[in-house]
Design a protein with these regions (language model features):
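Conserved beta-loop-beta connector loops within the AMP-binding
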Residues: 158-176
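Conserved AMP-binding/adenylation subdomain of ANL enzymes
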Residues: 5-22, 30-70, 84
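Conserved ANL (AMP-binding/adenylate-forming) active-site segment centered on the GW(Y/F)…HTG consensus within
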Residues: 142-143, 181-200
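Active-site glycine/GP-rich loop and adjacent strand/helix microenvironment
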Residues: 136, 149, 168-170, 184-189
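Gly/Ser/Thr-rich phosphate-binding loop
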Residues: 43, 68-73, 78, 82-144, ...
Length: 200
């Protein structure tokens, strides 16, 4: 479970979470990003609101009612949320919104930023096996909207050739994540573990 603790430290570092935050856990807790809302809140002393919603409008109602300062969600939910009118009160409290689980469509990102212009967008990339790998800092979003960003704290991200050597700039290769955030393998499945995990 050390990688979950390392993940909570990493996420709370780059999102700047603190004890006065209120995070909304709208994603399933069985999904690493959903569970991460709990561990990040526990690590930073923040308040976390669990939400089992039926409609996207329920998410907005909870954000307004609970004065949510941080929201992490996946593109399908953000697409639905971006089509709705947001209560103005959400923008008074929401400090950031973070995307995970797939690429955020540019038009969705633009719509969200128009609804909550003071909230910082954090675009994240990662694998379930390795928690998160990278994030694009908010100040880079306009300049490099399609970038996966830089390594999160406690992660080392490399681009390697087939022989295991590091690629040069603009050279294609395999994206490799190593460090404290990477799981040790698949439970009771040494064959799959050997297939996907490599010692570097």
């Amino acid at each position: 479970h050390r990688n979950m603790v390392a993940g909570a430290k990493s996420v709370s570092t780059y999102l700047g979470n603190h004890s006065s935050d209120t995070l909304l856990a709208a994603l399933p807790l069985s999904f690493d990003a959903g569970f991460s809302q709990l561990t990040t809140a526990f690590h930073s002393g923040a308040r976390v609101v669990l939400l089992n919603y039926l409609l996207p409008r329920d998410v907005l109602k909870a954000m307004e009612r609970e004065k949510v300062t941080g929201l992490t969600a996946v593109p399908p939910l953000y697409i639905q949320l971006s089509a709705l009118e947001w209560p103005a009160a959400i923008g008074e409290h929401l400090r950031y919104f973070a995307n995970t689980g797939g690429r955020m469509p540019r038009e969705t990102l633009a719509a969200l930023r128009a609804r909550v212009p003071k909230a910082k967008p954090f675009l994240m990339y990662g694998l379930t096996e390795a928690f998160r790998s990278t994030y694009l800092p908010p100040e880079e979003v306009d300049r490099r909207p399609d970038s996966i960003g830089k390594a999160i704290p406690n992660a080392e991200i490399l681009v390697l050739r087939e022989d295991g050597s590091e690629c040069g700039p603009d050279e294609p290769g395999e994206l490799v994540h190593r460090g404290a955030l990477v799981g040790q393998g698949y439970w009771n499945d040494p064959e799959k573990t050997a297939e996907r995990y490599k010692l570097l």
